[in-house]
Design a protein with these regions (language model features):
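Glycine-anchored, exposed beta-strand/edge motif detector
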Residues: 1-48, 61
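Extracellular, repeat-based ectodomains that mediate carbohydrate processing or recognition
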Residues: 44-405
């Protein structure tokens, strides 16, 4: 759904949407629990869009969201530009097609960037990883506990005593471990991963392990619960910036890796991956600029994990326009659909959503729908399995960069 009105708080917006039927461009939509999208005012729409809700009345960047299945809340972590870019988080409650928020809480009193978060379903904790720019840009993580509409935090813990940038985070639900993958600027930007163990309100880490001995950017992660493997997707700068993925196996507080596999033989300036538990496939979405294109078209590819190896189907273009690095994918487990939210550079950089269906090693798509008729960046998605809604967080450039839902 798009943000309604000229509320400056809509720049890093969270939205809920419902999808089915024909979707005209520029119309507000809602994302249904069945993974489809419908335009407001059409007869195919079964629910109306609720009113927008601002969660941060300031420039909001690096938003990352996750669903807390214990409290049935969505947690958004972000950098608050109105408060010295402090690391901040807020709890959202979905009701129908509306979302409301508690009071934002600071988890890091310093400039915080490259934020990612996940939910530890074993101990019912939210884990946020980030770059602490006020502490030499060290890689840092903190544990959050949701209570009602509030969230509290333990003490931040450094997991990498060097500057880190692009990163991904996921929860290994087989071994109840958190895995963080990142670019280690203290080691030539090598792709590195580390295993974290949550205990109470703290987190401890094993030793970091290099998975790519080259500059590694645009890192994302997901957990394949069918094979009990961690999948990391990234841009391999050392190999012509190709889109690459690798399979990780957690054992205790360590992680080991198979061989790297290329999924896109072209410049790949962003990745987001999710696990489709219906087909037992990983879906990687990304912008790419193969030699035949002049822009970074939106792509998706289906991946199959076998042991410590990963193979791919044929990449599919879901948006024939520049999607920059603003692609975010999540899996709707009710409808068994992959939902992708992205920046559509071919349509004034409007926030746009599209629904994909995996079949074998292929993925097919319906029609895209605009959820924000303004430039939208820092997009993040999460599936609320309690309300069966997809929540989209984004920065609404056309509305003062405020965080909104």
């Amino acid at each position: 759904m798009r943000i309604i009105g000229n509320n400056p708080a809509a720049d890093n917006a969270e939205i809920t949407a419902i999808a089915s039927g024909t979707l005209p461009n520029g119309k507000p939509v809602i994302v249904n629990s069945d993974g489809t999208v419908s335009a407001v005012g059409l007869t195919s729409v079964s629910q109306a869009i609720g009113s927008p809700a601002v969660f941060e009345s300031a420039d909001t960047t690096y938003a990352s969201s996750t669903f807390d299945s214990n409290s049935n809340k969505v947690v958004i972590a972000y950098s608050d530009g109105g408060n010295s870019s402090y690391g901040t988080a807020v709890v959202g409650t979905v009701s129908g097609t509306s979302i409301s928020f508690g009071t934002p809480v600071v988890y890091e009193s310093g400039a915080t960037y490259y934020i990612v978060c996940t939910f530890d379903s074993n101990l019912n904790k939210v884990v946020i990883a980030y770059r602490d720019s006020d502490n030499s840009s060290y890689g840092t993580a903190v544990v959050g506990t949701v209570s009602g509409t509030a969230i509290s935090f333990g003490t931040p813990v450094v997991f990498e005593s060097a500057s880190v940038s692009s990163k991904g985070i996921t929860f290994d639900s087989n071994l109840n471990k958190v895995v963080i993958a990142y670019s280690d600027a203290g080691n030539s930007g090598y792709g590195t991963a580390i295993v974290g163990t949550v205990s109470g309100t703290s987190i401890s880490f094993g030793s970091p392990v290099v998975f790519a001995s080259a500059d590694t950017q645009n890192v994302s992660t997901t957990f394949d619960s069918a094979s009990n493997k961690v999948v990391i997707a990234y841009r391999d700068v050392g190999n012509d910036n190709y889109g690459t993925a690798i399979v990780g196996t957690v054992s205790g507080t360590a992680i080991s890796f198979g061989s790297e596999a290329v999924f896109e033989s072209g410049f790949t300036p962003g990745t987001s991956c999710t696990f489709d538990s219906n087909s037992n496939k990983v879906v990687i979405v990304y912008p790419a600029n193969p030699s035949s294109f002049g822009q970074n078209y939106g792509h998706a590819v289906v991946a199959t994990v076998s042991g410590t190896s990963i193979s791919f189907g044929t990449p599919v273009v879901y948006e024939s326009a520049n999607t920059y690095d603003g692609n975010s994918a999540t899996f709707d487990s009710l409808s068994n659909k992959v939902v992708i939210a992205y920046t559509d550079g071919g349509n004034s950089s409007y926030g746009t959503v599209i629904v994909g269906t995996v079949s074998g090693t292929n993925i097919s798509f319906g029609s895209p729908a605009v959820f924000e008729s303004a430039s939208s960046t820092y997009i993040s998605t999460a599936f609320d399995s309690s309300s069966n809604r997809v929540v989209i967080a984004y920065r609404d450039v056309g509305n003062s960069n405020y965080g909104t839902s």
